[in-house]
């Protein structure tokens, strides 16, 4: 519309210069502003008829509703009903002469911290390793272009946990991971000191053996033939024996002289 107004403003001087009133009247008559306003009201009603406290929350249908209307406004109503037999979404409109193209998506959010309690005669058994789920088939009813024809049905499975919740399973997995990490830490705290002690002991043994060999080689008085006495002691013994023999020979010679 703005482009048309700008072009008209540019064309007006040229039209005035030509002094053609008939052309001006035709141009003014050709400018017709058409405004189409479409108002859509979608009241959403939810009715849950179940004796079950489930962790599912029915949210309003989210999607894009595109209406191709050229004449008048349209009033449409969307109802969301959930019963035991299934889930149905129906769209109704006031006008029956217009075509409707609607895309409705239903999202169901599951709460992880909620626990479903079923009113049944069966005994409840909670296990932390397995989760039992029940599936409730649902259907979405979408009308075609003509309201007299039946719409297409598409099934939507809804899973509801019965006995255990997802938070309990996550808690058990976290406990297992914590226990495994604690055991690994205990093993590492035991193994590392043992390995360090073995390394220190082997190094100390090698050092002591080396020091002993160095001291044994540096000592000159150690005999190599297995005798306990050193060479200096042997020489002193030889000198003593020579002296005693010489004294004895001198005494014998003196005694012989006296006898003569």
Curated annotation (Swiss-Prot):
Glycans are attached at residues 19, 28, 97, 103, 163, 177. It holds the Pfam family Endomucin. The modification Phosphoserine is found at residue 236. The chain crosses the membrane at residues 190-210. Residues 119-133, 145-170 have a biased composition (Polar residues). Coiled coil: none annotated. It is a single-pass membrane protein. Its main location: membrane. It is found in: Membrane. Highly O-glycosylated. Sialic acid-rich glycoprotein. Residues 19-189 are extracellular. Keywords: Glycoprotein, Membrane, Phosphoprotein, Signal, Transmembrane, Transmembrane helix. GO terms for cellular component: membrane. Residues 119-182 are annotated as: Disordered. Residues 1-18 form the signal peptide. Residues 211-260 are cytoplasmic. PANTHER family: ENDOMUCIN, ENDOMUCIN-RELATED. Endothelial sialomucin, also called endomucin or mucin-like sialoglycoprotein, which interferes with the assembly of focal adhesion complexes and inhibits interaction between cells and the extracellular matrix. This is Endomucin. It comes from Pongo abelii.
């Amino acid at each position: 519309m703005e482009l048309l107004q700008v072009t008209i403003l540019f064309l007006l001087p040229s039209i005035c210069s030509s002094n053609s009133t008939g052309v001006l009247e035709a141009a003014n008559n050709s400018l017709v502003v058409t405004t189409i306003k479409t108002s859509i009201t979608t009241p959403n009603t939810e009715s849950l008829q179940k004796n079950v406290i489930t962790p599912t929350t029915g949210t309003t249908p989210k999607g894009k509703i595109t209406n191709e209307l050229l004449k008048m406004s349209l009033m449409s109503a969307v109802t969301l009903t959930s019963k035991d037999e299934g889930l149905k979404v129906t769209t109704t409109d006031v006008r029956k002469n217009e075509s409707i193209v609607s895309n409705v998506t239903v999202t169901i959010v599951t709460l992880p911290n909620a626990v479903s309690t079923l009113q049944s005669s069966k005994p409840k058994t909670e296990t932390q390793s397995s989760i039992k789920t029940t599936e409730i088939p649902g259907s979405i009813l979408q009308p075609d272009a003509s309201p007299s024809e039946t719409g297409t049905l598409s099934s939507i499975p809804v899973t509801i946990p019965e006995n255990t919740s997802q938070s309990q399973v996550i808690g058990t997995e976290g406990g297992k991971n914590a226990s495994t990490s604690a055991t690994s830490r205990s093993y590492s705290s035991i193994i590392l000191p043992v390995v360090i002690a073995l390394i220190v002991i082997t190094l100390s043994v090698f050092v002591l053996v080396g020091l002993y060999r160095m001291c044994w080689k540096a000592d000159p008085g150690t005999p190599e033939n297995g005798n306990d006495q050193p060479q200096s002691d042997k020489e002193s013994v030889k000198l003593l024996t020579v002296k005693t023999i010489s004294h004895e020979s001198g005494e014998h010679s003196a005694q012989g002289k006296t006898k003569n």
